[in-house]
Amino acid sequence: MELFELTLHELHDKLAKREVSSVEATRALLARIEATDSRVNAYITVTPDEALAAAEAADRRIAAGGLTPLTGVPVALKDIFVTRGIRTTCGSKILGNFIPPYDGTVVAKLREAGAVIVGKLNQDEFAMGSSGESSAFGATKNPWNLACIPGGSSSGSAAAIAARSATATLGTDTGGSIRQPASHCGCVGLRPTYGRVSRYGVIAYASSLDQVGPVTRDVTDCALMLGAVAGHDPLDSTSIDLPVPDYAAALTGQVKGLRLGLPKEYYLEGLDPDVKRALDAAIETYRGLGAEFVEVSLPHTDYAVATYYLIATAEASSNLARYDGVRFGHRAAGAANLIDMFRRSRAEGFGAEVKRRIMIGTYALSSGYYDAYYLKAQKVRTLIMQDFMKAFEQVDALLTPVAPTPAFKIGEKVDDPLQMYLSDIFTIPVNLAGTCAISVPAGMSAAGLPIGLQLIGRPFGEETILRAAHAFEQATEWHRHTAQL
């Protein structure tokens, strides 16, 4: 087995036994990036010099007895996390040359743990997208089929895992942006409860919906990554001050007696036959493991996509007002005056999808429409939250599809925003409710593309869904399938 093929926990074990050095593992991964990324385009920026220096420091730390689960492990970050001294673009021309002067909290935590950051990953521009096609740095390709999308917006985070060009990655999830690409690329992707992980130093899209989470090769790696980045942060006012459990200790493999809910609104006509087949098989696997199933209802599901696209775009309209060409980012040349410079900098710097969402959000917040659109959407969001809380009175977790179809062809939906937005129909409600969910590999389509299942937990119920995902993983072989590049 090549070093780049090792999972995080397998590499950790080899580092602990001194069977391999961090420098060796990092060199192997950098060579893998060099060999694959011209085809996959998972990375925007690769940092070999910084990575090798960090690997050398990690080897010294290991020799001194300072090993943590992440020490010496090469990881990569979605290009939405500010990284001191390393270009951070958020997939946009407007930040094409932005080099932050500080690290975001999760980046600082990874560095403190001794992780080796090898680069910044491609994404939909400002995390606005479901396919990885809206990046100013070119579309990311799905390693399972280079003609297909990897999902978005954390496209590079999932594609790098599938291509074995990162040992573990971090992404963000605003409406499904971790879980959907994880499903399409055959990875494990976790969106933690809102407030579980600090957002300080995450470039904002929709502040009440954004959350940081890991994309990994298996559930054990996911638990280790979450444990490294979770926790209260005084720099993030929405961060929750709760103890961080030992997530890896929750992976007992036992789900006997676990009550899993099947929301009837998620199992309707129109679900892709391959997805339905994978979900039916997963349900039978869980039955065999001793889990119990209960039909539940989330009656306001039909309103989730419309609600999300009003709230998220309204928040984006506000958050992206800061990009004006004055203090940082792209500045248009030859402007006649200050107002002209604002207009031209934004017109040149933002892509089409970002402009579309800014306009929708500005309209929803405008005088005369605020009550009819934004305020009503917030009321419906409360109803969606209540739906989940009622469901969790009956069950421990929910089992649903992640996406209505496997990965589609690049360019197939780019001219049909509504169809693109509906790609997240099963993931968006979780973000509106603020709770946690995980995508885990559960099957393959007839065309050889991965399919994931989604486990949704109650707020701060990450241990439960990790345990359930791990039990499924142990009972199946889907996570062992690898893309052939």
UniProtKB/Swiss-Prot annotation:
Transmembrane segments: none
Keywords: ATP-binding, Ligase, Nucleotide-binding, Protein biosynthesis
GO annotation, biological process: translation
Active site: K78, S153, S177
Entry superkingdom: Bacteria
PANTHER family: GLUTAMYL-TRNA(GLN) AMIDOTRANSFERASE SUBUNIT A (PTHR11895:SF151), TRANSAMIDASE (PTHR11895)
Family designation: Belongs to the amidase family. GatA subfamily.
Protein name, as recorded: Glutamyl-tRNA(Gln) amidotransferase subunit A
Organism: Geobacter sulfurreducens (strain ATCC 51573 / DSM 12127 / PCA)
Gene transcribed to yield this protein: gatA
